[in-house]
């Protein structure tokens, strides 16, 4: 379990160039990607009432999302996650799964109790959650691990139908969720944001009140939950 504060902004490409140049002077690239760059695919779940979507859009103090996430279209690090947000404070529970478990989860099948993901899957199934949309984007990330600081730039955000094949390989055919000239800046920290990060990110674009999940649900074709 990890808890942190997240701030999100939507910025222009020109702002991205300015801010990323400053961030590179004080943070280091995320080691999980070449020069801190990698792609992410997240398959989100919701129920027939769109509870996960509505909790966010209705301004609920607490909202919960379940997702399966892959990196760079590879199957070596598949994660089932539950993300809980209370205002700007985020708590994440995560479990590694393999392709066999992925298939079972997508089919709504039961999971053996000895699996790490059992609790998450049981909760998700009890809520009647089924695949809702796949969100795909490219991320550029910079970190300062000793202070728990993470700054990311997400671009090329696409909405795709929620099928297993959208999590792996070179996925095509997505619908852009935001302009290709827009970037989502996320500032993440565990206690407070250092002043030098604030200085790097000063005069940023407007704060984003919706999630990539919500953006992609609205842009993509409705999936039959």
Question: Which stretches of residues belong to each language-model region?
Answer:
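Phosphate-end processing signature that detects enzymes handling 5′-triphosphorylated RNA
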Residues: 1-225
